[in-house]
C-alpha cells in the first residue's frame, strides 16, 4: 500500500476494485460450494458402497449356510477374504497407502462354488443365488477401486485458491493496519482453509482425517462363518 501512488486510493478506484472483487468473491463462493458438494457426493457414494458390500457378504454367507455343511470351506474362505480386505483398505500401519485393488479370493470362491454338487432343486437354486451375490460383491468392489480418484479436476481448486488470494490482497490493500483487522483477516483465512481442507479430505475417503469407517465390514466378521 505504501508503494502505490495516492491516486490509486481515491474513492472511484476503491469502488471499482470493490465491485470487481465482489464479482470474484461471488464466483469463488459458487465454485467452492460446488467443489464441496462434489466431494461430499463422492464420499457418500463410497460410504454406501462399503455398507452395500457388508450386507452382500452377510447375505452370501447366509445363502451358503442354507445350502449345507459342505459350504463350510467356502464360508471360511469368505471370512478370511473379509479380514484381508479390511487390512488392505484400512491398514493398521498408517504409513501404508490403502490398497483398493480387489484381491484374488473371489476367483477362488467362484471355483469352490462351481465345484458344489447340488442334490436337489433347492440346492441348485441356492448355488445360482450364491453365484449372483458373489458377482455383485465383485462388481461393488471394483466400483470402489475405479471411483477412488478425484471427483473433480484439481485445476478447479487451483483457480479457487488463486481467486481467494486476489480477494485477500484486495482486503489488505485498503484495510487499516491494526490488530482487529489482522485478527479478522486471519479468522477469514482459517475459515476458507478449513473449507479447502474439507474438500481434500472428502476426496480421499479411505485415508486422512475424514475417512470411511471399516466398522460395518468388521461387524460382518461377527456373522460370517458362524
Q: Residues of each region from the PLM?
A:
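Transmembrane signal-anchor/signal-peptide helices with a preference for the extracytoplasmic
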Residues: 30-51, 203
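N-terminal juxtamembrane/topogenic regions of multi-pass membrane proteins
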Residues: 1-36
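Alpha-helical transmembrane anchor segments
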Residues: 1-4, 14-16, 146-226
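Structured inter-helical modules in multipass membrane proteins
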Residues: 46, 59-149
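Juxtamembrane loop-helix boundary motifs flanking transmembrane segments in multi-pass membrane proteins
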Residues: 4-16, 52, 122, 129, ...
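Short extracytoplasmic/periplasmic juxtamembrane "stem" segments immediately C-terminal to an N-terminal membrane anchor
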Residues: 49-66, 213-226
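Helix-loop junctions at the membrane interface of multi-pass solute transporters
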Residues: 39, 63, 171-174
